[in-house]
Amino acid sequence: MRVYLIDGLRLNDYNKLENYLDKHLESSPLGGIYWLKLDQEILTDIQKEHNDCHSHVFALMLEETSLSSEFLVRITKKIQCDCMACATKEQRIWLMEQVDAIFEKLDIHI
């Protein structure tokens, strides 16, 4: 699986990210995982058709020294569905831009 990985976080960076993600994103029952909801405009046709599966998300995994996300569009309501898929190029770029914007907002420079 391809991933977007930012490593080399300092403890202060980790704390800022954890506070921000706790405040702005839904968290998974598994600690350190947050759901970043995709914009409707970048969903694939099948993802748009699957209203029962919304929201489509990327899973951000925060660890003490890194933040990562698989390039996999997931759903939170079911274990598996045809609308779960590897991210398109547009979705991958969107994810990286969203994460980079969070780092910029929090003044984290890696």
Language-model segments: residues:
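Short, intrinsically disordered, mixed-charge
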Residues: 19-27, 101-108
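C-terminal basic regulatory modules in eukaryotic proteins
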Residues: 54-110
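Terminal, regulation- and interaction-focused segments at domain boundaries
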Residues: 1-17
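Short, charged/polar surface micro-motifs in flexible loops or helix N-caps
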Residues: 11-12, 40-43, 64-67
